[in-house]
Amino acid sequence: KNIFDQIYEILIENLVIFFRNTSISPMAHLQFSENFGELDEPHPVYPSVEGFSRIVKLENDKNSPPDTDAWHTDLTFKQEQPFASVLVARSVPEIGGDTLWSSCYAAYERLSSGMKKDFEDIKCIHDMGDFRNTFAQSLDGKSGVERLNEGMSKFGQNIRNLIEKHPTSGKKYLNFNETFVSHIIGKTINESNAIKAFLTNHMNKPEDQIRWNWKPGDMAMWDNRVTCLLYTSDAADEKVRG
């Protein structure tokens, strides 16, 4: 086995893996990621690193806090969700700005046997959610309306099973995140909202989570299929992650 096969096996077993002080360049970041499959198209909303359209550039400070400060799984509203993400810290605050990941395997295992059975055949609508706000930034002008309509048409919604089975591990997991799941199919609005509220609370348990305090040059890789993540907005200084 080559080193990338070994990294993939470690990822499948641990869901999130970390590399300290890599000082990896954008080109090396791209080349590393390409060893695990075809890269996803440029992000529908966020800007990219100059010269590298497939690398998302995230910049936050006290005047521009992260808009991903709720539990989410990356891009579940797309028809083809990227199976993994690789994030590199470029500039980070001395205090704050941590990222948390939560296990969707553990969330499934904590369900009662009755709920596991009830949820087995349920499907959910995953919607682009607050990304509409970015698409609609210039709605006063014609270009803003066109951009929102284009985004809704291309990335608007996707239907996914609430209980999924991981294609590699074969283990079941709870395929829910509060940011992008908009409705439970077959349920009324009130029923759907009640189920979503229960699942949001159910999945936010410290015992299922890991918290990472970033240092410049750190790199994290996670399995998008079986993790939810949250960026904290408790840092006053600038933080940049490319």
What are these model-derived regions, one by one?
Residues 1-99, 131, 138, 156, ...:
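Non-heme Fe(II)-dependent double-stranded beta-helix
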Residues 22, 225-226:
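Short, surface-exposed secondary-structure boundary micro-motifs
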Residues 72, 226-229:
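Histidine-centered metal-chelating micro-motifs
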Residues 100, 104-219:
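Double-stranded beta-helix
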Residues 184, 222, 229-230:
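Short active-site-adjacent structural elements
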Residues 231-240:
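Conserved small/polar residues in nucleotide/adenosyl-binding loops
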